[in-house]
């Protein structure tokens, strides 16, 4: 609503100036005033949708916070090497969102390649947006960062200055306040999922290629149960204060946004019932025959020869080919 007042001042002032133009002022002024009224109608619709619908009272500040993690990014990157373009999974500098001592928060669909000394090596992807140096997730600095963001959003909402804080945050997006800690390059050709390749990983990789933002949201939703336990055990006061305040005022959409922000950097993917299912899978796997080669023999002139040793589709997924 406060931003709408600024827009109304600009559009109405422009309409008044157009009306003072000699000869053509009357028609131009009328057209400009009609345009100003149209803008006002759009503002009223936005105010109704964001202020009166239950659970949808988003402030500009929270939308700005969410934008730093859900910016659509291409699932493939291209680097230029001596005039030749190569498709790579290595993150460019534009995909790096936040850097800590042992972790990098980046856009989904790539893996950071960090140069240390005279060698470049891939960091281990812990989540679609977080990579670490050695495969362990140091959450101390990332927790402090999320606590600060959510605490600031809660304070701005409680003081009814969300539009002002959101405007300041959006302007701050144009600048880099966090210094670069690592030298990221695109010379590693990292794999998004290192290790044994299974059918599930292949499907997840394809989903990240189709829609990185969808992959990000799904991964965060699956980590919410573990994130709730972590924020209580770790005493994350900024996040807890934000969830408590937004729950008391009935802004459940903001509660979900805070949970997604926290789960994106501070939990492992844990599905409810996953432990029981994993135990049942361990027992059932005892009876699996595993991957095997179906050897086909043919008889030619009284001699038997091997005709084919190719793996079928399921066997190829189990063996990792």
UniProtKB/Swiss-Prot annotation:
<feature type="site" description="Cleavage; by host signal peptidase">
    <location>
        <begin position="267"/>
        <end position="268"/>
    </location>
</feature>
<keyword id="KW-0812">Transmembrane</keyword>
<dbReference type="Pfam" id="PF01560">
    <property type="entry name" value="HCV_NS1"/>
</dbReference>
<keyword id="KW-0899">Viral immunoevasion</keyword>
<feature type="site" description="Cleavage; by host signal peptide peptidase">
    <location>
        <begin position="61"/>
        <end position="62"/>
    </location>
</feature>
<keyword id="KW-0053">Apoptosis</keyword>
<keyword id="KW-1168">Fusion of virus membrane with host membrane</keyword>
<keyword id="KW-0553">Oncogene</keyword>
<keyword id="KW-1090">Inhibition of host innate immune response by virus</keyword>
<dbReference type="InterPro" id="IPR002519">
    <property type="entry name" value="HCV_Env"/>
</dbReference>
<dbReference type="InterPro" id="IPR002521">
    <property type="entry name" value="HCV_Core_C"/>
</dbReference>
<keyword id="KW-0325">Glycoprotein</keyword>
<feature type="transmembrane region" description="Helical">
    <location>
        <begin position="53"/>
        <end position="73"/>
    </location>
</feature>
<feature type="topological domain" description="Lumenal">
    <location>
        <begin position="264"/>
        <end position="321"/>
    </location>
</feature>
<dbReference type="GO" id="GO:0003723">
    <property type="term" value="F:RNA binding"/>
</dbReference>
<keyword id="KW-1043">Host membrane</keyword>
<feature type="region of interest" description="HVR1">
    <location>
        <begin position="268"/>
        <end position="294"/>
    </location>
</feature>
<dbReference type="GO" id="GO:0005198">
    <property type="term" value="F:structural molecule activity"/>
</dbReference>
<keyword id="KW-1048">Host nucleus</keyword>
<feature type="region of interest" description="Interaction with APOA2">
    <location>
        <begin position="6"/>
        <end position="57"/>
    </location>
</feature>
<feature type="topological domain" description="Lumenal">
    <location>
        <begin position="74"/>
        <end position="242"/>
    </location>
</feature>
<feature type="glycosylation site" description="N-linked (GlcNAc...) asparagine; by host">
    <location>
        <position position="93"/>
    </location>
</feature>
<keyword id="KW-1170">Fusion of virus membrane with host endosomal membrane</keyword>
<dbReference type="GO" id="GO:0055036">
    <property type="term" value="C:virion membrane"/>
</dbReference>
<keyword id="KW-0543">Viral nucleoprotein</keyword>
<feature type="region of interest" description="Important for lipid droplets localization">
    <location>
        <begin position="48"/>
        <end position="51"/>
    </location>
</feature>
<feature type="glycosylation site" description="N-linked (GlcNAc...) asparagine; by host">
    <location>
        <position position="80"/>
    </location>
</feature>
<keyword id="KW-0261">Viral envelope protein</keyword>
<feature type="transmembrane region" description="Helical">
    <location>
        <begin position="243"/>
        <end position="263"/>
    </location>
</feature>
<dbReference type="GO" id="GO:0019031">
    <property type="term" value="C:viral envelope"/>
</dbReference>
<keyword id="KW-1133">Transmembrane helix</keyword>
<dbReference type="GO" id="GO:0044186">
    <property type="term" value="C:host cell lipid droplet"/>
</dbReference>
<dbReference type="GO" id="GO:0044191">
    <property type="term" value="C:host cell mitochondrial membrane"/>
</dbReference>
<feature type="propeptide" description="ER anchor for the core protein, removed in mature form by host signal peptidase">
    <location>
        <begin position="62"/>
        <end position="75"/>
    </location>
</feature>
<feature type="region of interest" description="Important for fusion">
    <location>
        <begin position="149"/>
        <end position="180"/>
    </location>
</feature>
<keyword id="KW-1035">Host cytoplasm</keyword>
<dbReference type="GO" id="GO:1990904">
    <property type="term" value="C:ribonucleoprotein complex"/>
</dbReference>
<keyword id="KW-1160">Virus entry into host cell</keyword>
<keyword id="KW-1041">Host lipid droplet</keyword>
<feature type="site" description="Cleavage; by host signal peptidase">
    <location>
        <begin position="75"/>
        <end position="76"/>
    </location>
</feature>
<dbReference type="Pfam" id="PF01542">
    <property type="entry name" value="HCV_core"/>
</dbReference>
<feature type="glycosylation site" description="N-linked (GlcNAc...) (high mannose) asparagine; by host">
    <location>
        <position position="301"/>
    </location>
</feature>
